[in-house]
Amino acid sequence: MSPQTETKASVGFKAGVKEYKLTYYTPEYETKDTDILAAFRVTPQPGVPPEEAGAAVAAESSTGTWTTVWTDGLTSLDRYKGRCYHIEPVPGEETQFIAYVAYPLDLFEEGSVTNMFTSIVGNVFGFKALAALRLEDLRIPPAYTKTFQGPPHGIQVERDKLNKYGRPLLGCTIKPKLGLSAKNYGRAVYECLRGGLDFTKDDENVNSQPFMRWRDRFLFCAEAIYKSQAETGEIKGHYLNATAGTCEEMIKRAVFARELGVPIVMHDYLTGGFTANTSLSHYCRDNGLLLHIHRAMHAVIDRQKNHGMHFRVLAKALRLSGGDHIHAGTVVGKLEGDRESTLGFVDLLRDDYVEKDRSRGIFFTQDWVSLPGVLPVASGGIHVWHMPALTEIFGDDSVLQFGGGTLGHPWGNAPGAVANRVALEACVQARNEGRDLAVEGNEIIREACKWSPELAAACEVWKEIRFNFPTIDKLDGQE
């Protein structure tokens, strides 16, 4: 035996493989206020005990590796390791468990969602001992939250900038999403804003393609904004998508938007990446731009119930990284979204303090301290008949976005915008008068049709449209 080996042995190093649960499963651990807490849905491989699976998640997402290493003796594992501190079965699922893991705050770089996710959901999702793994929720402690800027402006500052109060904001995604020239695109923007919408929007995959380069689009959309503002007396905006192939190009586009004097830009935060998103968010705060966030690619990550990451985690990450709006499903439209679960992460986006509520999928109490809120955006397959439900579900602090539900109006874009604005104003007035939108919604819309031919035409076109498909990602215990 060499002297080196003898030295290592003499300080207690023992090579080999040992069970994770001997080090990382600590049911006696009392969580600290500064810990980041995670709730994982764990599906172990056959023969792997849930305690070992939960401990493996804690180890592989913090300080552990597959074998004992002598450099463990050069640090304090008790200080830095993740700990699986509780395991509970999932109701109705024999092979699934919720494993709760606590991570010491010093494991993470300040102000970096990128680093936080690299640790917590980095390698561990490919771990062979697990058949599947899903991150259901995170508790971000105030000590970590305070290292982030968060949304560039937040809900109240946005309302003050736009001078719009007491109702949801109305938007529209310009369709067809690809193929229009910049001038025709700007014309559609003008018609929608002139008809009564607050915002129009680039679709997520509108960047700078051969048929419409970004600079041309920005110029024609700015012209549409200023013309519609002059005619209506209302502040208008268009979400100019600054997403690009490099961070430098993205910022260049945001700079041009600022020079044009428009109020808001847009970013695809998952395809663009958290580092790019945080950089753009900082630029927007420094330069007075609102930031609209699209969640393109989210369903790749969050739709399957037993593997991936729930959208409530992506929503929390966005609030840290920064954005003033984010798409949050509709409950009633064409895209996936369970009602209680959606309302849970909508509250996590908007409110300062959210209590633990498992009936809405919220595993931890979340205190956002002074971090501004984010407006949830309801978008995808919605039309005027959905307006009462959307107003009731999302409340005033939201953006209701009708793409086909505006541009598909039989009389054109501007009448489509008029129909949506009239429907919204009717629902808000009825709610303020004490009427129940959930019960009387259709009647309220029919009454408004009597004095708005544009709304009457829209109601006739979409009276039979339904998206009656079951939700894939339901809360536990739901049939």
From Swiss-Prot:
Mg(2+) binds at residues 201, 203-204. The disulfide bond which can form in the large chain dimeric partners within the hexadecamer appears to be associated with oxidative stress and protein turnover. The modification N6-carboxylysine is found at residue 201. It comes from the Eukaryota. It is found in: Plastid, Chloroplast. Residues 1-2 form a propeptide. InterPro entries: RuBisCO (IPR033966), RuBisCo_large_chain_AS (IPR020878), RuBisCO_lsu_C (IPR000685), RuBisCO_lsu_C_sf (IPR036376), RuBisCO_lsu_fd_N (IPR017443), RuBisCO_lsu_N_sf (IPR036422), RuBisCO_lsuI (IPR020888). The basic functional RuBisCO is composed of a large chain homodimer in a 'head-to-tail' conformation. In form I RuBisCO this homodimer is arranged in a barrel-like tetramer with the small subunits forming a tetrameric 'cap' on each end of the 'barrel'. Heterohexadecamer of 8 large chains and 8 small chains; disulfide-linked. The disulfide link is formed within the large subunit homodimers. This is Ribulose bisphosphate carboxylase large chain.
